[in-house]
């Protein structure tokens, strides 16, 4: 499905640009009101259906007539890089049932409620240790909160789950920063990807020689050795877990700080009463949809959705970012309110349905501990430049912050 010359005048290009540094594209509100399911043109001239209402987005996420397999004809890719990546061997996030759940269940035990609860003391220790280092080094000059805190927190925790030796943390964090912070070239990012894959392959080999009870060790022992998966699968799954949520988590920590600076009365409430933190985290993940371009599908057969006929082979992009600002589900959706009372399952920051983010509980635990500890340790933390001068990610990409200079 491609746009013709006449169509391009009326069919908008997607991804849309954010309305401002931190606000979702204005087009979403207009489409929710007037055309909840409409066509958009992608980078290569192909067309896809864009779904913007909460109810329809949830339907897309759970309809088995729609496929997550990126190799299917018509699957909507948003960039040339995405199109190239679609040729790689898939992991569970790009699989349909039953293969999806077969592979996902191999790593799920590491992200259960019990496992995350057991990790909380380690997360707390990691967060507090990084903040203590910041305090010890002082802030005569502004300190980049991303480099010194927001990036290492989620990195160190996922490395520990995977089983990365502590002495390699700095090297891996450096490679991860190159591939994810948007300031490196495409070539540098690709080279960093290769370095990470090579490193993980070496780790898989080590576990074959010396079994250990970490995530890579269990993948090797329970799946690779019995022949359920190949070595390349083990490497790709480890890579997915290493990088998938990392940039998103870094951004959510930084965005949480900025959002509190924009809402000083809520910041004061949060400092006075840490029991408000879980509600703050839920609202943060609704208000700023950290991963907003991942809910893509292709129709396996002709089907009807919201009164529109979707043909087999046509792509669908379900905007969880738009759904998180749906007036029918969240009154005054453009207002940040940490007292907002809603079912956490209605917040779509982590997706919806069988493909909902496997690490949601871990991510929320990390964010809760970060915001319980950050202002308790640095009560006078402030951004050292005007908020409208903060360097953000490009406006057609996921909302995020590149650098966040702070003092305290």
UniProtKB/Swiss-Prot annotation:
Q: What is its EC number?
A: 1.14.-.-
**Binding locations of heme:** 357
Name the Pfam families on file.
p450 (PF00067)
Taxonomy, superkingdom: Eukaryota
**Iron in keyword set:** yes
Keyword line: Heme, Iron, Metal-binding, Monooxygenase, Oxidoreductase
Q: Name one GO molecular function term.
A: oxidoreductase activity, acting on paired donors, with incorporation or reduction of molecular oxygen
Q: Which co-factors does it depend on? A: heme
Q: Quote the PANTHER family the UniProt record gives.
A: P450, PUTATIVE (EUROFUNG)-RELATED
Similarity comment text for this entry:
Belongs to the cytochrome P450 family.
Record-given protein name: Cytochrome P450 55A3
Task: Name its species.
Answer: Fusarium lichenicola (Cylindrocarpon lichenicola)
């Amino acid at each position: 499905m491609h746009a013709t010359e006449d169509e391009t005048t009326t069919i908008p290009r997607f991804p849309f640009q954010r309305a401002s540094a931190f606000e979702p594209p204005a087009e979403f509100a207009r489409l929710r009101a007037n055309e909840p399911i409409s066509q958009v043109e992608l980078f290569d001239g192909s067309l896809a259906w864009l779904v913007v209402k909460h109810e329809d987005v949830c339907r897309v996420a759970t309809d088995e007539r729609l496929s997550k397999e990126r190799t299917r004809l018509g699957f909507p890719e948003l960039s040339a890089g995405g199109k190239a990546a679609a040729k790689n061997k898939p992991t569970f996030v790009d699989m349909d049932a039953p293969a999806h759940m077969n592979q996902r269940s191999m790593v799920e035990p590491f992200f259960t409620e019990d496992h995350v609860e057991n990790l909380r003391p380690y997360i707390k220790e990691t967060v507090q240790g990084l903040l203590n280092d910041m305090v010890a080094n002082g802030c005569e000059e502004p300190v980049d909160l991303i480099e010194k805190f927001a990036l290492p927190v989620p990195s160190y925790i996922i490395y520990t789950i995977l089983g990365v030796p502590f002495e390699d943390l700095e090297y891996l964090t450096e490679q991860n920063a190159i591939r994810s912070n948007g300031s490196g070239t495409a070539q540098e990012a690709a080279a960093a990807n290769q370095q990470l894959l090579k490193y993980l392959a070496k780790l898989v080999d080590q576990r074959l020689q010396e079994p250990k009870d970490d995530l890579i060790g269990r993948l090797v022992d329970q799946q690779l050795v019995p022949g359920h998966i190949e070595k390349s699968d083990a490497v790709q799954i480890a890579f997915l877990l290493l990088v998938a949520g990392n940039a998103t988590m870094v951004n959510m920590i930084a965005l949480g700080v900025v959002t509190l600076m924009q809402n000083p009365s809520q910041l004061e409430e949060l400092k006075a009463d840490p029991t408000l933190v879980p509600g703050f985290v839920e609202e943060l993940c609704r208000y700023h949809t950290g991963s907003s371009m991942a809910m893509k599908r292709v129709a396996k057969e002709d089907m009807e959705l919201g009164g529109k006929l979707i043909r087999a082979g046509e792509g669908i992009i379900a905007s969880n970012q738009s759904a998180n600002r749906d007036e029918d589900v969240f009154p005054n959706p453009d207002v940040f309110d940490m007292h907002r009372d809603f079912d956490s399952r209605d917040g779509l920051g982590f997706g919806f349905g069988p493909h909902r983010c496997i690490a949601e509980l871990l991510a929320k635990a990390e964010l809760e501990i970060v915001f319980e500890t950050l202002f308790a340790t640095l009560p006078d933390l402030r951004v050292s430049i005007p908020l409208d001068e903060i360097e953000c990610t490009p406006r057609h990409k996921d909302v995020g912050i590149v650098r966040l200079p702070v003092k305290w």
